[in-house]
A protein has these predicted regions:
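PLD/PLD-like phosphodiesterase catalytic module centered on the HKD motif
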Residues: 1-277
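Phosphate-binding P-loop
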Residues: 278-282
Length: 282
């Protein structure tokens, strides 16, 4: 549960890594609301360990993005929203090892998995434009666990692999009960934006989202906004010196959580729920 985690007040690259915060929050949560400017699915790949447990445990994610995506991400989102998914074995979602491998690689299977998760509303996207003519540039979010406990954050990091593993980024974290008022503010901000009830953002169809090859945006600016989705796990040009791994404490915690019983995806039968509750009480 989120209340059992001693989150730090802030996380900064090179010290307490933002990636460490996101991973630990994901494995303790059942819902993740993310208010963004720029989204890249490479952020999911960077957090593959956390996302695999989050999804396998029934987690649901809602994401508010601006009107620029990579070509591959836009296609994956459109395919999911239109239920255009072929040859994806949904049972992989309850196999944590296979799911982690799927989410960590930039390949066709990853994007099919992303599309499938979108098609069954496990990950939802809403695209927005600013009413002021600029770019949506919010960077905040709220995690919620199955008991309703919440943790919020705000900071400099876009949701991408570059931001989580290479850039210098800082985020501030708000936890219960000391920061309940601030958490409620961010939850309200997200919910209003999601319902299209805010004066500074307007919803647009994903079809209208621009891709990084759009000529209206300078190449240099786009490269700054959206990373090139380099697979840092397999690219030897990136030294481990620059990419700080997850702490051993968190890796040990992930390993323990992988052993917890969970319901086969996607249905949860009453007999399984009773067996699970009996196991927990022993």
């Amino acid at each position: 549960m989120l209340k059992d985690v001693k989150f730090k007040h802030s996380y900064s690259s090179g010290y307490d890594e933002p990636k460490e915060f996101f991973t630990e929050a994901l494995i303790e949560s059942s819902a993740f609301d993310l208010g963004l400017g720029f989204f890249s699915s490479s952020g999911i790949r960077s957090l593959a360990y956390g996302f695999a447990l989050f999804i396998a445990n029934g987690g649901k994610m809602r994401v508010i993005i601006n009107h620029i995506l990579s070509k591959e991400d836009k296609q994956a989102i459109e395919n999911g929203q239109k239920h255009l998914i072929e040859d994806f074995e949904c049972r992989v979602l309850s196999d944590i090892d296979k799911l982690t491998k799927t989410l960590s690689k930039e390949d066709e299977h990853f994007f099919r998995c992303l599309s499938y998760l979108i098609s069954i509303n496990r990950i939802e996207f809403i695209a927005t434009i600013s009413t002021k003519g600029g770019l949506g540039h919010d960077k905040y979010g709220v995690f919620t666990d199955e008991k309703g406990c919440k943790v919020a954050f705000i900071g400099s990091a876009n949701f991408s692999q570059s931001a989580l593993e290479l850039n210098g980024e800082t985020i501030t974290v708000f936890t219960s009960p000391d920061d309940n008022k601030r958490i409620a503010e961010y939850k309200t901000l997200f919910d209003r934006s999601w319902e299209n009830d805010t004066p500074h953002l307007l919803h647009i169809p994903i079809d209208n989202v621009k891709t990084i090859i759009c000529e209206k945006f300078p190449k240099i600016a786009i490269e700054e906004l959206l990373d090139n989705s380099v697979n840092l796990r397999t690219d030897n040009s990136y030294s481990n010196t620059y990419i700080k791994p997850l702490s051993q404490r968190l890796l040990d915690k992930i390993e323990l959580k992988e052993q917890e019983p969970r319901f086969p995806f996607p249905e949860e039968r009453s007999i399984q729920i009773n067996a699970y509750n009996a196991w927990i009480s022993n």
